């Protein structure tokens, strides 16, 4: 099942179900579920509830997608996004080539950092260039995991039931800010730096766990990234199990699982984003997240 957040014709922002073909929308409020945000609804959208919703929407007229304004599925995350750095081997190599001082690529343990998201950028929304502050703007196409229930001290091999679903996240990054500060938080947390979407696809739509999905990124139609989430160094099962040891991961937590090779800083010479560039992040089985830099 696919979930979105959208603005209805009357201006109300509502979580909703999206049809598999992306053409029809059923607001949850039409189905008797009164939740202000999808984050609020997620803990209650169990497999049993979703099965009932599937039956219910079969008899209810839908809104056409053109009648609503698509927002990010989780427009304002309750907590910072948890991110993994250097989680594909080929990206590790290009990051070290760009700046071994700023990117610690030799590691035996996962690298975690957080990303502040005041308001997530929806599919079709704008990446803010911040040209007064940023001269080296970069993209990072990533698979993001959304937790469906609180996780604490979950053993590896038992994390699957804690995953609500998956979405696409573009971890937009200011490389010059990163290298200047020798850390990643500030350079990844500027307003307009976190496109998320276009929807959340529930975990039961994918047979494998962790899923092994083709992941690609295009800039102005040119393929820049082309990999598979199965090539992650630390997979989703490992990450949830490790992070939940001594730390409670709340339902609705978003974990961005790292980007593959092909980012702008890894090119020779580096090629960074400028206003007017269009970035498309694509993960098979989820969709395409398209944003323009301004």
List each model region and its residues.
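Short beta-strand segments
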Residues: 7, 83-84, 114, 138-148, ...
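Catalytic-pocket segment enriched in acidic/His residues
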Residues: 13, 49-50, 61-63, 68-69, ...
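Short catalytic-site patches enriched in acidic/histidine residues
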Residues: 98, 111-130, 151-152, 192-201, ...
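Structural signature of FAD isoalloxazine-binding scaffolds in flavoprotein oxidoreductases
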Residues: 100-121, 139, 274-285
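Non-heme Fe(II) oxygenase catalytic core, chiefly the N-lobe of the double-stranded beta-helix
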Residues: 121-159, 164, 169-173
